[in-house]
Curated annotation (Swiss-Prot):
The chain crosses the membrane at residues 150-166, 179-195, 212-228, 237-253, 257-273, 287-303, 671-688, 699-715, 740-756, 817-833, 836-852, 894-910. Keywords: ATP-binding, cAMP biosynthesis, Cell membrane, Cell projection, Cilium, Glycoprotein, Lyase, Magnesium, Manganese, Membrane, Metal-binding, Nucleotide-binding, Phosphoprotein, Repeat, Transmembrane, Transmembrane helix. Phosphorylation by RAF1 increases enzyme activity. Phosphorylation by PKA on Ser-659 inhibits the GNAS-mediated increase in catalytic activity. Phosphorylation by PKC on Ser-553, Ser-659 and Thr-916 inhibits catalytic activity. This is Adenylate cyclase type 6. Binds 2 magnesium ions per subunit. Is also active with manganese (in vitro). It comes from Mus musculus. It is a multi-pass membrane protein. InterPro entries: A/G_cyclase, A/G_cyclase_CS, AC_N, Adcy, Adcy_conserved_dom, Nucleotide_cyclase.
Amino acid sequence: MSWFSGLLVPKVDERKTAWGERNGQKRPRHANRASGFCAPRYMSCLKNAEPPSPTPAAHTRCPWQDEAFIRRAGPGRGVELGLRSVALGFDDTEVTTPMGTAEVAPDTSPRSGPSCWHRLVQVFQSKQFRSAKLERLYQRYFFQMNQSSLTLLMAVLVLLMAVLLTFHAAPAQPQPAYVALLTCASVLFVVLMVVCNRHSFRQDSMWVVSYVVLGILAAVQVGGALAANPHSPSAGLWCPVFFVYITYTLLPIRMRAAVLSGLGLSTLHLILAWQLNSSDPFLWKQLGANVVLFLCTNAIGVCTHYPAEVSQRQAFQETRGYIQARLHLQHENRQQERLLLSVLPQHVAMEMKEDINTKKEDMMFHKIYIQKHDNVSILFADIEGFTSLASQCTAQELVMTLNELFARFDKLAAENHCLRIKILGDCYYCVSGLPEARADHAHCCVEMGVDMIEAISLVREVTGVNVNMRVGIHSGRVHCGVLGLRKWQFDVWSNDVTLANHMEAGGGRRIHITRATLQYLNGDYEVEPGRGGERNAYLKEQCIETFLILGASQKRKEEKAMLAKLQRTRANSMEGLMPRWVPDRAFSRTKDSKAFRQMGIDDSSKDNRGAQDALNPEDEVDEFLGRAIDARSIDQLRKDHVRRFLLTFQREDLEKKYSRKVDPRFGAYVACALLVFCFICFIQLLVFPYSTLILGIYAAIFLLLLVTVLICAVCSCGSFFPKALQRLSRNIVRSRVHSTAVGIFSVLLVFISAIANMFTCNHTPIRTCAARMLNLTPADVTACHLQQLNYSLGLDAPLCEGTAPTCSFPEYFVGNVLLSLLASSVFLHISSIGKLAMTFILGFTYLVLLLLGPPAAIFDNYDLLLGVHGLASSNETFDGLDCPAVGRVALKYMTPVILLVFALALYLHAQQVESTARLDFLWKLQATGEKEEMEELQAYNRRLLHNILPKDVAAHFLARERRNDELYYQSCECVAVMFASIANFSEFYVELEANNEGVECLRLLNEIIADFDEIISEERFRQLEKIKTIGSTYMAASGLNASTYDQVGRSHITALADYAMRLMEQMKHINEHSFNNFQMKIGLNMGPVVAGVIGARKPQYDIWGNTVNVSSRMDSTGVPDRIQVTTDLYQVLAAKGYQLECRGVVKVKGKGEMTTYFLNGGPSS
């Protein structure tokens, strides 16, 4: 079994957080449930407690049935790791699915009339984020793409001006005013193109340029209507249609401005047509058709602009959400890393995370994280008089006092280049020279000892208790690392560590060192003989020569003075910038500011100021996003990831991911195509004669499109339809290939409706009829001849032979075909190449029919009859031979150019939409990838942290930055505590070359502890919590929180007893397979304890109290291979049927005589 087998959990749901919780709403936690010491408290014996949530009894014990150990809710507490939604909605209150939550089921309830009208009005409103700052970011986000689009539009408009100039000047004498207008417009578009590409071009300038373009287009439209010869309500109708379309699609303006501009251009053309053709008998028919045509064009524009902008805003919002989650995770990871590296050295933590990441196969032995360091100094410090101090205060006050003292020691250790290893009760030990080797490691430990003695003097002064520090130092070799699988604590082992532990018996206020340490001091300190062997049997047995430090090194004094001077200078320079904080009270007997400085309380309070002044999370996200927008290059992104013409990703995996994107608005696209079809039908019925066949074709196409819309709507309407229909709907809507095919099919149906009526019209060339009547060749027939024969424009009756009606205004066929092509732009999910191919195929089909098919006669007849109409309007009569030429290019020759211009605009818009969508996808994918990397890193960190601290304790310290002297503790009413030690392991441990200087002995100890950890991980022992290991002693407890405490059944106590017996069995199994004879002593006790963490910056979870001390004594006074329990525990276990025997009265240090029992077995049943 691999060492991390107990850590890795199969990933069931990708949306799980690193805690193993699902992204979703959690059950609300109520702060008022926690009271007393059951809720975390942050107290200090040097100052008043932080005001907790109002509780009825803040200092009384809280029974566990009150759901203790619940964290107080507050900012930053209990934050899920999924994406946090923020108020980023639109001003029109459009509802979008919050990031990181499940998609909300569509609202299928019937809407009222006002509600439907409100939803419809929302479509025409400009979209805008509620936050002005976010809106500016959004505009910056798409600025480069809009700038590129606007530049291309200028080029298209310059080309369009050239086309209009050619159409006007080619057939007849051009009008100078209109030529000058087109020339000026072309020059202005070129100038605007240059302006758009300047580095100083900004968002405000873009809007100004857009409105200038609209003004120029309106002027060109007016000039074209006035210059038309002959005048006609349908003359040049394609031009305002084109202007309206590009207003919605290629101009970067808001929806409201686009709607107003599109309606304005449409109204302008209608007014001009009405004023210039007021005497035409067919004026109102054509004006009605023009109104429908413009309404359809504006509808297409809205159907294109609205989903494109909403998609862009949602993509931006999603990208921002991913960035927000990434920064949130990054912040949490920094806190995790800080907390993790405060407990484990960096090289150990990184190696553990690497092993979790690589997921190595099971090995015969668990991996051991041990390193050897040869030249280090080990310091052990013990508080002399601690028992007297403990007798004068409660357990909580004692823990708070130790916390503040050890927090000060941690600061001193950092200043003196020492690494704190562990805190064992009132014992503090640290090492200098690891993880980085130092030549002055002995000096560092001695200075650390001097500072510790100075610090304890303040405790002695303010408490009135005679406490001192016993400090012992030894230099030599250590093995450092962690053992086991759970609740890792960095530790050191070696014979030199054992020796250093015995060296602390040097006496109060003195530093006791060995000769090995003295040799590293280079004579910088005065010493005297220590005679350690007289006070400690181990030192006497090992013949260790010891010394006592008399005075500090002069060199070190000078260095410290210089450092203190620099710190004072820096503090003075910051004094005007930061308010000085002074605690409300210290120990009950003093408020001496010097004492505060000596204890380091001022400094520790400053440590948290950075957190207070931290940037607001929302502002941090916006600032990061702004920098990312400024740094990214659209052109470079396209070059690196997207093929130039096809706009497909260069990497196949990206293309596959993109192709799996589902467009939820596909049903709306088909509905827009149905709307365009209806408009085309209205135009055809208004302008052209129709037959029963045409009505049947229109009805069939209408039914096909309507059925398609309904099928697509089934996907969003829940389970009201048959399963087969739902499956068909999902297959269409959720498949890019199928939805593209259906989109092309819909456009094809609309195109058929636009050209179907052409085949029912009269196809007889009017020239042929007139030539027969006038005995002329068809080439010689002119408009004047037709005028003489009383032919006129607008007659529906057949002009020549045949019964088919005459289609007098084929310009509307062109307009309807343009509408059918524009309908393809509504389908935003179809690729630009697909739209280009579809446009060319449909356009080519139409041109073949126009130029080579029977309908060609319709367009030739129209050009002649338009000349007749012009002659009639001029009230002049001409001879057939002297007839003036028609002042315009023939419609069938204009049509290919018009189709080409529209195809170019359609392709540019499709390129813009697809390019934007792909770049948004790319950026969101990158943000998602970075977020996932952060989540993986967070998962690794949390797995490590949860093997160092309990989950709720780790969450407490990750919630916000903690001060060094800040305390986290809980009062627990009834906890069972176990100490299990291998009595003869010290005899087994030897340091020889054959066993790699003792590493192999530690490897076996690691296997033993790992087995114990695997057992405690079993479901039946879920109420147990491993506390720590102390050398070869294993410490565990049960009933430490609400989920594991059983007040009625006391199952947590019996679980610990079962675990103790299970360890005895496991040790026998280990002895059989390792050919050893290890003997275990286990001690059990129960009662109240205080559980908490000492050292907020270097947290170490532990439990304290008389219960813990007695449990330890049950182990130390026990008998090998037996489990010794106290009378309190005996009463609980005996009532449950456990087999126990009375040992008798045992003398226990600090407790006198106690009656104890041996646990022999479980219940008889």
